[in-house]
Design a protein with these regions (language model features):
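Phosphate-end processing signature that detects enzymes handling 5′-triphosphorylated RNA
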Residues: 2-266
């Protein structure tokens, strides 16, 4: 049994060192869910969508707004503040902390229905995050248009979580908007795979784009699903990009640079 487990883990994460695998196993054990992700090179994105049999006309439109200081103080502290408009579903918000260690989180926090601990695993690494999710307390578009305080979008519990982990002296209302990013989301269950796959296409203002394929699973099945997913995608000629960029980091960097350029031009 141990040999089978070892083979499965090796197939799921061949680029990770032994000490990383040990760390990953510990994080997965304490998480609520695992999301397996890979991004695809720009030149192969269209063929990847076609190979999975997903219909772009069924894509859901999203606008993702990030908030940080102009020099990304939150990102350096491991805090992400996001508000999102979702076609047909309404607006939602999240305050995220990463990386986290599940044993370090309080039982009260773990019991809250809006708090989720998830491991994001890519071909080249992984991170465990704690996300405080909520429904936007005001319509995002209206709130931003009239210049309402940013804190008004977030629940009392989200604001408290932010205050606990944000850099000292940086309040929610001190943050600037970075975005929004236009996102298309497609999802489906390929017959030969038997699990739901999600494709997100993030379109950046400079014409660059990231296409990410992902699937979620329970922690107990993470390595088995990772191995099966790797095989399924490989059989369809879908390979992970050598440079696995994260969507959020690229968005924050892009808009931070844009703010700096605008400031320097004044």
């Amino acid at each position: 049994m141990l040999a089978v487990m070892s083979d499965t883990v090796a197939a799921a994460a061949p680029l990770l060192a032994q000490h990383q695998l040990v760390e990953l196993l510990g994080l997965v054990k304490g998480a609520d869910s695992v999301e397996l992700k890979l991004s695809v090179d720009a030149g192969l994105q269209r063929s990847a969508v076609e190979a999975l049999g997903l219909d772009p006309l069924e894509a859901q439109v999203r606008l993702v707004h990030f908030f940080d200081t102009p020099d990304l103080a939150l990102e350096r502290a491991g805090v992400v503040v996001r508000a999102r408009r979702v076609q047909g579903k309404g607006d939602d918000t999240v305050v995220k902390l990463r990386p986290v260690r599940p044993p370090d989180l309080s039982k009260r926090l773990r019991r809250h229905p809006g708090f989720v601990v998830e491991v994001d695993a890519m071909t080249t690494g992984f991170v465990c995050s704690g996300s405080f999710k909520g429904v936007a307390q005001e319509a995002i578009r209206d709130s931003r248009a009239r210049g309402a305080p940013l804190r008004k979008l977030f629940t009392k519990e989200q604001r408290a979580f932010y205050a606990e982990h944000a850099p000292e002296g940086v309040g929610l209302d001190d943050l600037v908007e970075l975005g929004p990013i236009f996102v298309l989301k497609m999802k489906g269950t390929p017959p030969a795979y038997g699990r739901k796959l999600v494709i997100e296409l993030w379109l950046y203002p400079d014409g660059d784009r990231i296409l990410e394929i992902s699937t979620k699973c329970a922690p107990s099945e993470a390595f088995q699903v990772a191995a099966e997913t790797r095989a399924f995608l490989g059989e369809r000629g879908i390979a992970a990009a050598e440079n696995q960029q994260t969507k959020t980091r690229k968005a924050l960097s892009f808009f931070s640079d844009e703010l700096k350029e605008a400031s320097d031009a004044v």
